[in-house]
Amino acid sequence: MQWPCQIKLVPVRAPYFDGANLLVAADCTAFAYGNFHNDFMKGRVTLVGCPKLDGVNYAEKLTQIFLNNNIRSVTVARMTVPCCGGLPFAVKNAVEASGKKIPVYVVTIDPKGNLV
């Protein structure tokens, strides 16, 4: 685990990003899904944020992270709620803007903690 983990606070260049499999998770996912650490965080560098509460477009920051580091893959963990829709959208836009071929996977969790 690295520190910081908030998307807004993490630097755009850091040694822990080199060759990393990245997890970009909505804030609520770790609380809704009981085995979040083992199933999603293990072996990944984790960034968290809430598109609704943070009120920013993460695409710019993520683009800089992708441009400045060798990211191997990105897994997005989001909730089924509409406000989480911005997270995979921002990641996909950032990968496209970086010009790199980084695989993106999206995992969706419902409020009861089930994978959907």
Model-derived regions: residue spans:
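Iron-sulfur-associated redox domains of electron-transfer enzymes in respiratory
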Residues: 1-116
